[in-house]
Amino acid sequence: MKLLVACVVSMILAGCAMLPSSFDAQEHARIVTINQLSADNRVCATRELAQTTSQEITREADWVHRYGASLGNNEKMTRMHANLLAMSRELSERYGRGEVSVVYCRAKLDNIHKATQTMIGVSARRPRL
């Protein structure tokens, strides 16, 4: 009897895995990573750390933008991805020119953090089917 129950449960679980999901874990995870990086107040303390972090945020934002653009029914998120990528590129390029103050760094990271907070909320609850 236990074997029969185990077989039925495993078949049900395997069947559930075949149903499409509206939640995209890959996109969501990358947005959360950007959110975490932008929330760290210590990032702007040194130029080297801020530059490295801004480059990492830009790489993640570029991935999210390219990935999101390749999906169907994702136009609104793709616009948010484009804005996030523009903000992150601006910060990264400023560090490339050496023109960044701590105040600017914190303000830009705060804007990125707020944008990703909105994106997290949207990506967690939207259907994409």
Segments and roles (model prediction):
Residues 1-10:
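Sec-dependent signal peptide recognition
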Residues 15-16:
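N-terminal Sec signal peptide cleavage junction
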Residues 22-46:
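Post-signal peptide N-terminal segment of mature Sec-exported envelope proteins
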Residues 23, 27-30, 53, 80, ...:
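Amphipathic alpha-helix face/heptad-repeat signature
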Residues 36-39, 89, 93, 129:
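Long, low-complexity or tandemly repetitive, helically biased scaffold regions used
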Residues 44-55, 59:
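Membrane-proximal N-terminal soluble sensing/regulatory segments of transmembrane proteins
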Residues 60-108:
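Long, amphipathic, charge-rich alpha-helical segments that form helical bundles/coiled-coils
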Residues 103-129:
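C-terminal partner/receptor-binding element of secreted or periplasmic proteins
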